[in-house]
Amino acid sequence: MRHLWWPIAILGVRHRFGCTVKALLWLTIILACSVVLNAQEQHGLVVLEATGGKIRVTIVRHGQGADEVIEVRENEKWVPALTVNGFATHVIADTPGKLQDCSVESLSADQNASAIDIVSSCTAGRMQRTLSLTSEADVIAVRVRFTPKEGLAIHSVEDRYSFAPGRRAADTPVLGPVDFVWSQNIKTGPDSLIPQWDFKSPAVMLQQGSIFTALMPSLNARSQPPLSLDLDVTSESKPWISYGAVPSEPYGHSYFRRDSKSVISLESGGIEYSYAIVASSQPPKLGYRRIVRRLWQTLGHDGLLQSADLQQNVRRPSLATFDEWRQDAWMRYADEVYRRVDCPGGGCGTLSSNRNYLGQWDKPEEDAWFNAWFQSLRTAYGWYLYGERTQNTEIRRKAESVLALALKSPQQDGAFSTIYLVPSDRWIKEDGWAGFPDDYHTFCMSWTAYWMLKWAEDLTPNRKDEIVTFVRRYGDFLVSHQEPSGVIPSWFDSNLKPRSEFRELNGETAGSALFLIHLSEITREKTYADAGRRAMEFIGREVLPRQLWWDFETFKSCARKNFDFYDSVTAQYPQNNLSTMQAAMAYLELYRVSKQRRWLETGSNVLDYLLLTQQVWSPPYFDPKLLGGFTTQNTDAEWSDARQSYAAVLLLDYYQETGNVEYLERAVAAARATFAVAPWENWAHTGFQNEPGAMTGFHWGTGSAMTSVEIMSGKLGDAFVDVRRKHAVGFNGCTVKKLKISGNTILLDIEALPRLHELNIRFAGINQKVRYKLAVNGKDPIAIEGQELVRDGYIAKLLARN
């Protein structure tokens, strides 16, 4: 019976034991009718519910306004998720700006029982708001149009909802006011917000228990500012989320706040925006995965299919195919920055970043960086792969000389320096601008040691003993300094004492776990595996509950802040995605070693959280193609940062383990994204200026991106077909428009850049004992053995129309 009482309150009938049976019976009949009719006006009450749906909207006329309740179905009961008292849409107008009074003129459902229209008259104009059912069982589409009166200054129009489950009083690093909260950016004050400049994966989300809800803007190629999302967990009696036309202004690095003085341009005669309400019962703290899937389904997937030219450079359009990029990266750029280095025994070299470890950017130095950002070993790995592919002995020799230099880093009980200065023949422990130059940094050392092991496994097995000897000493250092909790401190001074910052809590521990688990695979020593597992158990216990992805970049990079910074308005901590990436990698390593599916499941959860920082569209107000790129953290605003090349390989690895084709598509988009903005590290670093970011060197741009392509192209070729899963994707300057698999016949329609005359198509899920028939772009099918497709792929000659 309690389930029926809340509409009584909404209708203004206060339930008491003395109320008449007639009143209760009347309300029960209304609710029964609303369920039968789905969307029907009954005495000022309208209910919108999809057949078999998970979401229901109830709107009741209340005085001059209309109260709303968005409910989700949980355990066969309807539970409130979002509420509105009076008016969902808030209009700020006049000078000075003030909230406008509105009055509902009509509230009605359409004849098909699929939409509700609310028409209101406001002191500043006329408003129509339409809520519609969709093909998705947990989604309501909302469209708002506000037509202002002539001569009035309109400052903002936005829809705001209260989160019905409310919040708890708790606010600790493992238990917050709500179980899950997410916005692209956090706040430094109550008037901060998330403008369209920050719409990488546009949504705001809240979850308490199993009740999950989100607002998702409906975007397209014509979407232009000012559009903004907002979220507040603690300032009012209940948390709220909002979306609408709200001007903003930038401040700090890099935040935005409401611009109360700005007036919205009315070129089209009115203000319009659309969005989706997503609400449903979801696994605790994991509702965001529903949004990750929907973001790609509604924006990313179609954008990828439409774009054959995602890797075409915005400033040098002659660079578009991977072979063109190979010439630019490996034959020109790498040769320009390569330097031979004198070292004991000889054979050392570097691909210089030409940075300054103290951040004195006007004083660049020839150097070698073995850093979590600028990882020379990884770039040299890609260069070596290119040398193998082209049978270029000189390139392989130069690439291996970078490994030789890294192995010369002086060790102190296993800890080692990660920056080498060529002119002064000097090793520096760590980055002095984004770290502490006199301290050893485990995040950078572990990433370097991991890539040393990759060299030993994949490229230079003849140096395996030398490499393992070096990294084993470092592995022993980590094991001996791991805290009982499982955390591995981030920084150690010259006496190998841990620094207080990040000593007891950090996300960088995941990077050390990744290395330790990989080391255990090679050495077969359980000590390293146990230490890596304990480290990831720490991540699961202390980091995941409130997504405390704290690494050096969170606090020590351009978006600087104190180590104790916390956004008490949205109840979110600052976080950065470098540690998130390495955590997803470490969970995957744990799964491969242990074969325990729980590690793969947790890793997939972490990967999906990481994907909230991937761009699912290319905004029309920026020049480059930005689909697939990654931003960095929730206190900065750049687009298509070079880290996306790291994420691309990670996504491909998860695709191979899970079979989730979305991961494959996202991997392709991420791998292409850097090339659109290279050689710069990113685009629109402050979020809103249509210009390239800084030039931070070969290893954070062209070189790092090309390395990912070399790693991935052996599996993906120029285009890739997974026969078992019946899915295909273009990788190099092409897109698969159509795939049809019938028995052993494979039909492909591929659109490619005009300059590509042939494509190497690679295959997975092939039965090697079967003969296939393969046809590309309408040509006659050819017969080809399955084992040949697996071994060599297929070279498709393209028609002149491409």
PLM regions: where:
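C-terminal beta-sandwich/jelly-roll accessory domains of carbohydrate-active enzymes
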Residues: 729-802
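Short beta-strand segments and strand-loop junctions that repeat across beta-rich extracellular domains
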Residues: 58-82, 481-485, 489, 520, ...
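Tryptophan (W) side chains
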Residues: 5-6, 26
